[in-house]
Amino acid sequence: MIWFLKIKMKVLTTLFLLMFSIVYTSAQQSLEGLWKTGKEETIIEISFSNEQLIGKIKFSNNKEVDVGKIILKDLRSEGNKWVGKIYAIKRKEWYNVEIISKEEVLELKISFGLMSRSLQWKKSKS
């Protein structure tokens, strides 16, 4: 009877670890893809590079924007959100950012000093 309980515990442990890894992997991939920033027609591509999640400018109709420039870096998962750094092109500075993924929308909260600003990026189909 004890051997049966040991086998049952091993199976349950394996199933738990498998479910945890699937949930963790899907959270890791939730930011990946193309995102429209809003006002300007700028598209950011979020992907893994050297085992880190980064965001690069893929396209923009704004001539001041350097296509290919990294604007999101040091992203790491913390619970239900991602934290890292975002580059403000107009100010030419890096700021802290929190990102929450909600289906087809990314909610970004950018912190600078005692102030913060919120943005929404929408999933791009192209």
For the regions a language model picked out, list residue spans one by one.
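Bacterial Sec-dependent N-terminal signal peptides
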Residues: 1-29
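Short, conserved beta-turn/loop elements at beta-strand boundaries and strand-helix junctions
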Residues: 51, 104-105, 126
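Central antiparallel beta-sheet cores of small beta-barrel/beta-sandwich binding domains
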Residues: 29-96, 122
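Short coil/turn motifs at secondary-structure junctions
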Residues: 60-62, 115, 126
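Short glycine/proline-enriched turn or capping motifs at secondary-structure junctions
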Residues: 10, 14, 112-119
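Short, exposed beta-strand-loop hairpins at the edges of beta-sheets
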Residues: 98-101, 105-117
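Short beta-strand-to-coil "C-cap" segments at the C-terminal boundary of structured domains/repeats
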Residues: 120-126
